[in-house]
């Protein structure tokens, strides 16, 4: 299977006003003029051939089929297949990273660029809802609860399709279902995202696919679902994963060259501003540790209790009252 290489520049979006008219224009813009795949959103042909090939000489092989095709399950399944297409996965990935002015900013995305992802913005939410929440609703309507089942429907073509799918399940719900609606993130989409994240890690995608491993703003999203889990064993995996990413960043602060174009470029970017790169890696590790300690202590995130209808324990109430982490919730 060949992946088309379409070259296009990545435009940084302008911030819209709060009016619905402007929001509508922005949604229309994203529908009509989203940039196509740039050099870091398309797998080089030779690399993809190595991934998909069954040759034993390949150092990394992407498993295209996890379980047999289960076929259509009525209108809901047909609707899902209509919504969850390769084109939509490409559009989501382009939208998610379009604010980065240079491809090199994907390797190390500074805090000024990460705000788009982690600071609540109604205009950003509106686009997520208009463009991508129909896919989420189509998934919900099928009642799919297995990550492997969903993967058998999607059939990711490359590691970048996996990236888009994880962002779709782990991040878009957080932009689409806020406030009292947030429970669906925690009870439905998060478990799917965790399963697919763990499957990706088991296949070695974030650790071995160069366009993920050495492009750290890509790699980070593979591990985010683990951070959101309330399962301590999943956090153990998250700690290991973020530490591996940090070690890779540190390995680039010295030496020259690399085994592929992605590693070579990543080394150039890191060595151009090593403190910035180190901060990105260390911050990810520390942020996961802040999440894990809460799960280790309470077995769950206290700040989710209200929206999930869980009774607040006294020690949890004390924790929140004293300024315990809620991570923006």
Features from the language model and the residues they span:
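Intrinsically disordered, low-complexity activation-like regions
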Residues: 52-329
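N-terminal mitochondrial targeting presequence
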Residues: 1-68, 75
């Amino acid at each position: 299977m060949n992946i088309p290489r379409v070259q296009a520049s990545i435009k940084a979006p302008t911030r819209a006003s709060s009016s619905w008219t402007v929001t509508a224009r922005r949604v229309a813009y994203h529908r009509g003029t989203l940039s196509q795949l740039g050099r870091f959103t398309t797998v080089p042909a030779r690399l993809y051939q190595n991934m998909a090939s069954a040759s034993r000489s390949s150092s990394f092989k992407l498993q295209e089929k996890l379980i047999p095709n289960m076929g259509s399950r009525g209108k809901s399944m047909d609707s899902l297949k209509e919504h969850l297409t390769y084109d939509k996965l490409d559009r989501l990935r382009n939208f998610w990273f379009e604010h980065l002015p240079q491809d090199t900013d994907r390797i190390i995305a500074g805090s000024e660029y990460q705000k788009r992802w982690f600071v609540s913005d109604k205009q950003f939410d509106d686009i997520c809802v208009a463009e991508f929440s129909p896919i989420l609703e189509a998934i919900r309507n099928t009642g799919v609860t297995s990550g492997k089942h969903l993967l058998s429907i999607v059939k990711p073509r490359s590691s970048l399709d996996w990236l888009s799918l994880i962002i779709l399940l782990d991040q878009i719900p957080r932009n689409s279902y806020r406030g009292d609606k947030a429970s669906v993130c925690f009870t439905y989409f998060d478990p799917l995202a965790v399963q697919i994240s763990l499957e990706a890690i088991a296949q070695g995608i974030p650790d071995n696919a160069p366009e993920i491993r050495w492009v750290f703003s890509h790699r980070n999203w593979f591990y985010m679902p683990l951070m959101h889990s309330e399962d301590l064993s999943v956090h153990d995996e998250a700690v290991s994963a973020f530490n591996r990413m940090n070690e890779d960043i540190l390995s680039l602060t010295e030496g020259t060259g690399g085994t592929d174009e992605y590693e070579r470029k990543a080394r150039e970017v890191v060595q151009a501003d090593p403190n910035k790169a180190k901060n990105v890696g260390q911050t990810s590790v520390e942020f996961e540790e802040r999440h894990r300690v809460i799960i280790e202590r309470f077995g769950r995130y206290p700040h989710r209790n209200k929206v999930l209808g869980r009774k607040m324990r006294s020690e949890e109430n004390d924790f929140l009252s004293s300024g315990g982490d809620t991570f923006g919730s």
